[in-house]
Amino acid sequence: MLFLLSPAKKLDYDTPVQAQTYTQPLFVEQAAALIKVLKTKSADEIAGLMSLSQALAELNVGRYAAWKKTFTLDNARQAVLAFNGDVYEGLEAPSLSASQLDWAQEHVVILSGLYGALRPLDLMQPYRLEMGTRLETPKGKNLYEYWGSTIAAYLNERQEGEGAPCIINLASEEYFKAVDLKTLKARVVQCVFQDWKGGAWKIISFHAKRARGLMVRYAIEHRAKTSEALQAFDREGYVFDASASSADKLVFRRRLD
């Protein structure tokens, strides 16, 4: 069983990390080809393409210029420790033990516009390139066309030999669209997190993102082997709602009031 996560825009390359174990990213050549395209863009063009402020655009132009095909602990950091958005605050990877990180390495995949798919301990140089960016490349007009069936084929390879391959999708729609479902062999189970607000159950973006990270943390701590094992998830007030769920959609709800 594999858990899919989105990356985060917010990165942390400053906080000291304990983990010295790392692996090399798998799609370096594909990432290098994207960097080559990005290096042709000015800060103004990057700002327009990615809807960034001038300061952020200039920061990322600098990142593309500094990017190298060689990844070390001097120029990169393990992906799960570098991402720092709502999902990763829920996951709290820095507090995972070495054996828990090893389990995550085998069961968690982080989707990425630049790197395609990252394992938690894969080294990652800082970047900004969201999957929905309309970056034209020789392969097409956007990143979905660039990655094509590559990510799905990789996920198939990861689950080769498993009797009933299953993917728990905790990624956003923007990122999951990069997984070609015609190529993918595994059953996909979606996790939905809803809060009661204004008299109705709603997906509140900030809470849902954090909950995705909490779910991965729960799976790591319990070494979850099946989607059924996730039904016991109860972090921060969420409870599995069987009546709102189906075999391929697990709905968790909580009342904040």
Curated annotation (Swiss-Prot):
PANTHER family: PEROXIDE STRESS RESISTANCE PROTEIN YAAA, PEROXIDE STRESS RESPONSE PROTEIN YAAA. This is UPF0246 protein BAV2675. Pfam families: H2O2_YaaD. One of its GO terms (biological process) is response to hydroperoxide. GO terms for cellular component: cytosol. InterPro entries: YaaA. Belongs to the UPF0246 family.
